[in-house]
Amino acid sequence: MAPYPAVDWAPHPIYRPVKNNYLEQAGPYPYEAEYIRMVGGTTWHWAAHCWRLVLNDMRMQSLYGVGVDWPFGYDELEPFYHESEELMGVSGLPNTGSPRNLPFPMEPVAEVWATKRIRERLAIGGYEVVGNTTARNSRGYHGRPPCCGNNSCQPICPIDAQYHGGIAVSDAEAAGVKLLANAVVYKLEHDEKGRITAALFYDQNKVSHRVTGDTFILAANAIETPKLLLLSASDNYPAR
């Protein structure tokens, strides 16, 4: 994450050269999760892999006795997978093990020579190489050019052929959304029915602000979202 330094008011997990201990490793299997806390998030520094879950992923407890089963099935999630793929511009082939009702928005990005050679050699032994599924343009898509093979998907695509959250932000602002950057939400308030009524956030000067609204969408990540919910615990909804 070095190309995107953390800021004092919104640090992200750092492990090298020195740990900043942003994440407390309290479990038996430490996991050095890395992500960026900024507008656009970790999509500024990713390889754009956009794999869907396979069917068995949603029934880990039932099938393997570990974890928990999802509270709904793959079929309910599938339309939203495709909607996300359309928004980001995902390319790939259908042989990923995840059922699809509609094809990918784009055909796969051109295969590099090394991948082609490996696939051909493994085919002799009866092995199939499954192509990657990425939010990277194989052709012009939504005003952005196709991948030109710069091999710099991380830390950033130099021509915007690869999706990043900043694209969605630009689209939202063009539609009239007001973006408040450098704002770290630290608590959610709710009414007696449990509906969220306000969000409290600190700006970069550690000044607290309160925003009210009719609808709130919580879309941080698998760590920051539950963290915020725990910080927002109340008598009616205690932390568990």
What are these regions (language model features)?
Residues 37-47, 216, 220-224:
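FAD-binding core of FAD-dependent oxidoreductases
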Residues 39, 58, 196:
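Short clusters of hydrophobic/aromatic residues that line enzyme substrate/ligand-binding pockets
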